[in-house]
Amino acid sequence: MSDTIAAIATAHGVGSISIVRLSGERALEFALKLSHKTKLTPRHATFTKLFNQNNEIIDEAIMIYFKAPYSFTGEDIVEFQTHGGFSVSEVLLEELVSLGARLALAGEFSKRACLNGKMTPLKALNIQDLILSKSALAAKIIARNMQGNLGELLEKIRTDLVKTLAFVETSIDYADDDLPSDLLEQISTMCEENSKILKEIYTLSQSKKGLIEGFKIAIVGKPNVGKSSLLNALLSYERAIVSDIAGTTRDTIEENFKLGTHLLRIIDTAGIRESKDVIEQIGVALSKKSLEDADIILAVFDASRVQDKEDEKIFDLLANTDKKIFWILNKSDLENVFKNTQNKNFIKLSAQKDITLLKEELQNYLNSFDSEGIMVSSLDLINACKISSEAIFRAKGLLEESSLELFAFELNLAINELARFTKDFQRDEILDEMFGNFCLGK
């Protein structure tokens, strides 16, 4: 990390300011050359003109120097706040490169912060998730995670496991000395408690992932029951073609919309029925796949049509799902001839006139999800918690069987999984993969 890196840290486009970030051993040197200053006071904003090597002015900017180790990366950092737009920040970046800086890789500033012990990989992931959060509720949950509760909990578990492993490996080295029975009981209890905590984290995160990622809602029904009209009503604009011709929607249509504080991804599916049309068959297959991926299902039926075999197929399709289903009887402003033989609690509405009741029911259901507690948005971390929990659970069983070598193996597996997120981690290839999806300048 001896080279000095530079990147534009703000989004590209027209705006009032752009920020160019510089980090490394020569950051201060480059800043002094650009500004024609002889010194900079750390953590002070300096208004200055910036010049290229031909002594031509680049811009007037605010320059802030953060002296190592008291900076985001732990290295010397200089941030330049220039006028916004496409050109000025690019010209400044080119000038920094000509002075000897290197263009930063995606996420390289955060990677250096981790390698220099300024943050854990877990906090870096939380920062990235916060940047990418799609709703106020998601941002709130992620910001809470950033306060350290999750990191402290995982580090405590990892530390417990390391201490336990030390006891057990000592016992393996000195095979004649058995572990005391009271210590064995303590270790068994520790394994049980920590496995349970990690299991709660990953199960809670999976069950409530919609609070962060957005809930997926699939609209399903036979052709021509008003699914596309319902989609348009939820979006409050005409997104899907509405026609009396059955089979108009042959592909899935997906759109995002917000309901209160919740981000929703709604999917209008092709009408499910038997068809010889190859294209329509593909659409029906996609519809069934959408149901598997959905968190919530809106099952739509037509109040103005007598229940038939195609309706029965919808009931059968949804009979064994564990997804939340809202049963909707559309076109209820017309003569109602649909017989509720399945005794479903239908929401009666007209998608072309008023869906207020459905929105209220949806919002009440979404609000019932408790946003408190520890939730993880990173799939990698969810998997790490799952792997660690299962390894510790297996270790407990092996301890009871006095298989100490295998116990140590399982504990090592759990420790290594947690260590990727809770402590300074030196395996560059894994960090490269982790931070490769970050923004430039972050």
Swiss-Prot record:
(6S)-5-formyl-5,6,7,8-tetrahydrofolate binds at residues 21, 79, 118, 442. Mg(2+) binds at residues 228, 249. Residues 214-367 form the TrmE-type G domain. Its cofactor is K(+). GTP binds at residues 224-229, 243-249, 268-271. GO terms for molecular function: GTP binding; GTPase activity; metal ion binding. GO terms for biological process: tRNA methylation; tRNA wobble uridine modification. GO terms for cellular component: cytosol. It is found in: Cytoplasm. Its EC number is 3.6.-.-. It holds the Pfam family MMR_HSR1. Its main location: cytoplasm. Binds 1 potassium ion per subunit. Keywords: Cytoplasm, GTP-binding, Hydrolase, Magnesium, Metal-binding, Nucleotide-binding, Potassium, tRNA processing. It is an enzyme of class 3 (hydrolase). K(+) binds at residues 224, 243, 245, 248. Belongs to the TRAFAC class TrmE-Era-EngA-EngB-Septin-like GTPase superfamily. TrmE GTPase family. Homodimer. Heterotetramer of two MnmE and two MnmG subunits. Exhibits a very high intrinsic GTPase hydrolysis rate. Involved in the addition of a carboxymethylaminomethyl (cmnm) group at the wobble position (U34) of certain tRNAs, forming tRNA-cmnm(5)s(2)U34. This is tRNA modification GTPase MnmE.
